[in-house]
Amino acid sequence: MKRRDFFAAAGAAATAAAALPSAADEPTQGKPFQLGYAPHFGLFENLAGKDHVKQLEFAASVGFRDWEDNTMHMRPLDEQQRLADAMERLGIRMGVFVAYGIGSFGKLSFTGSDKKLRDQAVEEVRASIEVAKRVNAKWMTVVPGAFNNRVEEGFQTARCIDLLRRCAEVLEPHGLVMVLEPLNWWANHPGLFLRETHQAYEVCRGVDSPSCKILFDIYHQQIQEGNLIPNIDMAWDEIAYFQAGDNPGRKEPGTGEINYRNVFKHLHKKGFEGIVGMEHGKSLGGAEGDQALIDAYRAVDDF
């Protein structure tokens, strides 16, 4: 065999071998992750099937111990209970569902002065208490609606704080926490009030309640402001929850520009024991995409 042909054949064999799962890799499949990464329904349906309990069981079998479901509050009560029972059996911790935000992004509920809209926001948060208790959730997402183009931002901030204090008073006796999620203007949600970390920090300091904290979505904040680790550090004492997604594309870590291994290593070093929601899609379809997602989290959790 010619020397050139030998090296070509050797290289092809090495590539093929690397693509196969090794025996050493197999035990890591069910090993818990170092951080509390929380998938959502649909991410594993190619490998686990469409039944939600089967997806929970599959997630637990490959090492996930947390879950989130934005629309949990919209599911039938018997389905909520079925999922809660399955999570308890599997040792899965429930993350966020949306208490206020779905269908309300365009409303001036928190930044306006309409009493009806403001009272409605409080009642939606109140209605979430029973859902949280049923599914053993501690955190719920709140998005404080639209930016008010007719009012100075400082006045909007004050109005937002006032209304969030009312919501916090409803949640505090139950030990529940609403997490405020800043959302980016440039790719997904132009015109929303809460968009940057310093804003969310200012608002939470103003509300001054253990029931009002920040949901730091790494995808959104990379687009809106960048400077991820320093901003996380600055707002650390008000952050209760994280979500992930790479940019551009909002797919699994490793498909974009964010150094997720370093970000997650930083969270772990700071002692974060909460949830990192996997609020993103997959870069590949079918069972291959499901497995690529698992592999991506194993890779960025390797620190």
Model regions and ranges:
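Histidine-acidic metal/acid-base catalytic patches
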Residues: 2-60, 194-216, 220-303
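Active-site acidic/histidine proton-transfer and metal-coordination neighborhood
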Residues: 10-19, 27-31, 51, 89, ...
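Short glycine-enriched loops at secondary-structure junctions
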Residues: 45, 98-101
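Catalytic domains of carbohydrate-active enzymes, especially glycoside hydrolases
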Residues: 54-72
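A structural motif
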Residues: 64, 132, 137, 239, ...
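Glycine-rich, proline-tolerant flexible connector loops at the mouths of alpha/beta enzymes
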Residues: 68-88, 144-148, 188
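Catalytic-core regions built around general acid/base machinery
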Residues: 82-89, 166-170, 231, 263-266
